[in-house]
Amino acid sequence: MTIYEGNYNGQGKKIAIVTSRFNEFITSKLLSGAEDMLIRHGVARENIDVIWVPGAFEIPYITKRAVHSQKYDGVITLGTVIRGATTHYDYVCNEVSKGVAQVGMNSNIPVLFGVLTTESIEQAVERAGTKAGNKGAETALGLLEMISLNEQFHVESVGMN
């Protein structure tokens, strides 16, 4: 039996972090957590590119562009969608999650989903560095592990867009 496991060594890795400006009071904390975690694990600050987009809905498009640039070993997506009084929340959450998943499945590099989808501002604050940890930092750690696993397979996928 062969067991594959990733590690968290970020040395020499180039990372893109696509971040939504909407709800920036939360996303900026997620971004800080992600950057800090990457740097702690050996990613050089100059090898981290932050790409700001207007809102969560725009994340998949720019993520796809970042992947196709072939400049990165992996991409993190960060955003915050907080339920309001209308159904807008449901549409945005569904489309951003499907879009990021589709980009990831059609990519040769890991693309991780760090978009918070919460019922309240309080839940978002908790996940941006208070009671529930920092989901940006957790996503960054997951990305490093996935980059390591990806490198273990050296598979060129056919038909990647």
From Swiss-Prot:
It comes from the Bacteria. One of its GO terms (biological process) is riboflavin biosynthetic process. Gene3D superfamilies: Lumazine/riboflavin synthase. GO terms for cellular component: cytosol; riboflavin synthase complex. The keyword Transferase applies. Pathway: Cofactor biosynthesis; riboflavin biosynthesis; riboflavin from 2-hydroxy-3-oxobutyl phosphate and 5-amino-6-(D-ribitylamino)uracil: step 1/2. GO terms for molecular function: 6,7-dimethyl-8-ribityllumazine synthase activity. It catalyses: (2S)-2-hydroxy-3-oxobutyl phosphate + 5-amino-6-(D-ribitylamino)uracil = 6,7-dimethyl-8-(1-D-ribityl)lumazine + phosphate + 2 H2O + H(+). Transmembrane segments: none annotated. Its EC number is 2.5.1.78. 5-amino-6-(D-ribitylamino)uracil binds at residues 22, 56-58, 80-82, 113. Catalyzes the formation of 6,7-dimethyl-8-ribityllumazine by condensation of 5-amino-6-(D-ribitylamino)uracil with 3,4-dihydroxy-2-butanone 4-phosphate. This is the penultimate step in the biosynthesis of riboflavin. HAMAP family: Lumazine_synth (MF_00178). Belongs to the DMRL synthase family. This is 6,7-dimethyl-8-ribityllumazine synthase.
